[in-house]
Amino acid sequence: MAGHGWGTAWVLVAAATLLHAGGLAQGDCWLIEGDKGFVWLAICSQNQPPYEAIPQQINNTIVDLRLNENRIRSVQYASLSRFGNLTYLNLTKNEIGYIEDGAFSGQFNLQVLQLGYNRLRNLTEGMLRGLSKLEYLYLQANLIEVVMASAFWECPNIVNIDLSMNRIQQLGSGTFAGLTKLSVCEIYSNPFYCSCELLGFLRWLAAFTNATQTHDRVQCESPPVYAGYFLLGQGRHGHQRSILSKLQSVCTEGSYTAEVLGPPRPVPGRSQPGHSPPPPPPEPSDMPCADDECFSGDGTTPLVILTTLVPQTEARPSMKVKQLTQNSATIMVQLPSPFNRMYTLEQYNNSKSFTVSKLTQPQEEIRLTNLYTLTNYTYCVVSTSSGTHHNHTCLTICLPKPPSPPGPVPSPSTATHYIMTILGCLFGMVLVLGAVYYCLRKRRRQEEKHKKAVAAAAGSLKKTIIELKYGPEIEAPGLAPLTQGPLLGPEAVTRIPYLPAATSDVEQYKLVESSETPKATKGNYIEVRTGEPQERRGCELSRPGEPQSSVAEISTIAKEVDRVNQIINNCIDALKSESTSFQGAKSGAVSAAEPQLVLLSEPLASKHSFLSPVYKDAFGHGGLQRHHSVEAAPGPPRASTSSSGSARSPRTFRAEATGTHKAPATETKYIEKSSPVPETILTVTPAATVLRAEADKSRQYGEHRHSYPGSHPAEPPAPPPPPPTHEGLGGRKASILEPLTRPRPRDLVYSQLSPQYHNLSYSSSPEYTCRASPSIWERLRLSRRRHKDDAEFMAAGHALRKKVQFAKDEDLHDILDYWKGVSAQHKS
């Protein structure tokens, strides 16, 4: 005994050492590991506390997992999907009542599955899905009542199935038909209901060779007339006790016949005329029979009288749906004999059953509430007999998804209302836009009328001013009043005009010297062009130097010419065509009524070119230079005639030379006209008469006057020499040969416009220096008149510069005298 005790101890120590060498389990499971952490076996049986779910701390390389004798209630796909190498799974003796469809789909290597002694009620196709290599399936000692015909379709390699000790009443003929490798099928200890519906399975079972030979334990339990019958008869009296032979003899196309001896015995509780099945044949007696009455074989064979009866099948409970709502249902249950058995309505959910209500009426309506849409609910009529539940009929209800509420469909009246509202809004917008357009158009017309009225008033006012200014000079018989102006230089010189007594006779008048009583002159041409108001100078751009200042002043002349271009053409043509007789005059004072421009004549070279006059500050130095054009021929220049934009009476002037100015030979001299005769009478042909006569003639010269001039560089001014000594007012008079000076020390250079100044904004009168912003219609007009006017103004300016460039000395003098009067008119 002592040796045996020591041997047992050594075995336990060796087992413990082996388990520790293989690796101790994580948690409460014992693991047997291999190389590189590979786990062969995990024993998690009889855990304390017992597992209620499959543990997840086990290595996913496990091959054999044993979880028997725990409290696992369900098998989920998520708990088994990580064990891809699992081959053997033992879940025996748990509380499993629900297996998720496809729970074993990740165990494609599983060969042995033990689910015995659990609480499964149904066996469906989804529970065994994916077990293509499964060979041994143990489902004994469960609560299985229904085995679907397609339950084993995905397990073609099954060899052994154990469905014993369950509650199976019916099996289909095709339940095991596809299992070609099946050798053992244990179905004993099930309460089979022997009827013609079981005949197909009985035929398969008779053809199947079961290796275990447990036919004596497979019996019918119901109906009571066939209780105790074996599914397959064996032994001495097996043929008579086999339900297969009995059903084959009585079942034809859904009905069956039975062997009866004597009148049929009524079955208690099922005594309905025409509906009770025939009773089973009586048990054979052991009494010996007479020799002449005994048939061959063992024992006495009773005489059996075969009678064919019209069998009546037993009425079974029925269920149908009466009404379905979004969360409830009403079912109708009909019971053939509610008092023969105890019927209840059971709900099956995940292999679990719940009693809904007891059925005590032949026909009842049961309302089922708190249901969910898109969920299958299974209800069965169950009867209890000898502690066993029998399913008579089942019904599956699935509440459909409630239809989505239809969107608001506008009625025809509403749609019409919307359409009319939209059309009304559009029509209203059209009316508003039309009204706005009408108002703006009316306002534009009013503005145009106002502009025309203002332009007419301005023209009338200008004409009135001209008449008021020059009218007395034309009509007065005597001397016209003189306009006061600033004195020029140290001595004031004036030119006093005399008007003729009669228009028919041309008389000679002598010029008297007025230097003894100095008078303020109206201003010479230089002052007229440079004596600008302060506000006009502020509106112009700042001038970087004197050459640009001279360019700007020449530009102002070009700007004014565009408005009176036709008048200039007529005037120039008239002045060029008139025949004037010039008489020598004594150099002396100039008229104070009009500003005088003194011109310089110098010897002509072989080639002449027109240059703009240059004004200088000093007396007698750097005076105004006048170069004649190429067409001009050398000769004595004529005296200038003054035209101020209005028709003047013909008049004569007498010039008296008061002194002689001596300058160096290289200096430029200003000579208007000199003659040894002391007095010279200047006769001027009336310009207005010639203007009217030569109006048509002027159009012939339009083309060459509108040609654009070339660019000529301005001649730089000469440095001013020191001013000479002058006498007082009572001394020597200012000679006409001396250049007129400006009262302010500022040089002005009149030069031709270069192309870079052609786009300058300029004008020669204050009212055109700063223009008001155009109105809204002028800004929005597609083809504005401003571009056209600017083009005409530029063309007119170029035409004037062309005329000035090619004009001869007397024509140039007439143009400058004319603009002297126009500038004086604007200044006034």
From Swiss-Prot:
Domain LRRCT: 190-253
SMART domains linked to this entry: LRR_TYP, LRRCT
LRR repeats: 61-82, 85-106, 109-130, 133-154, 157-178
Disordered: annotated segments: 258-293, 627-674, 697-731
Subunit comment: Interacts with PPP1CA.
Stated role: Postsynaptic protein that regulates circuit dynamics in the central nervous system by modulating the temporal dynamics of interneuron recruitment. Specifically present in excitatory synapses onto oriens-lacunosum molecular (OLM) interneurons and acts as a regulator of presynaptic release probability to direct the formation of highly facilitating pyramidal-OLM synapses. Inhibits phosphatase activity of protein phosphatase 1 (PP1) complexes.
Modified residues (Phosphoserine): S460, S646
Topology feature Extracellular, residues: 26-418
A single Gene Ontology CC term: synapse
UniProt keywords, alphabetically: Cell projection, Glycoprotein, Leucine-rich repeat, Membrane, Phosphoprotein, Protein phosphatase inhibitor, Repeat, Signal, Transmembrane, Transmembrane helix
UniProt-annotated glycosylation sites, renumbered to this chain: N85, N90, N122, N210, N376
InterPro entries, alphabetized: Cys-rich_flank_reg_C (IPR000483), ELFN_Fn3 (IPR055106), Leu-rich_rpt (IPR001611), Leu-rich_rpt_typical-subtyp (IPR003591), LRR_dom_sf (IPR032675), LRR_TM_domain-containing (IPR050541)
GO aspect biological process, one term: chemical synaptic transmission
Keyword Glycoprotein attributed: yes
Domain Fibronectin type-III: 312-399
Source organism per UniProt: Mus musculus (Mouse)
Record-given protein name: Protein ELFN1
Biased composition (Basic and acidic residues): 697-706
Tissue: Selectively expressed in perialvear somatostatin (Sst)-containing interneurons.
UniProt feature, compositional bias: Pro residues: 275-285, 714-725
Membrane topology: Single-pass type I membrane protein
Annotated signal sequence range: 1-25
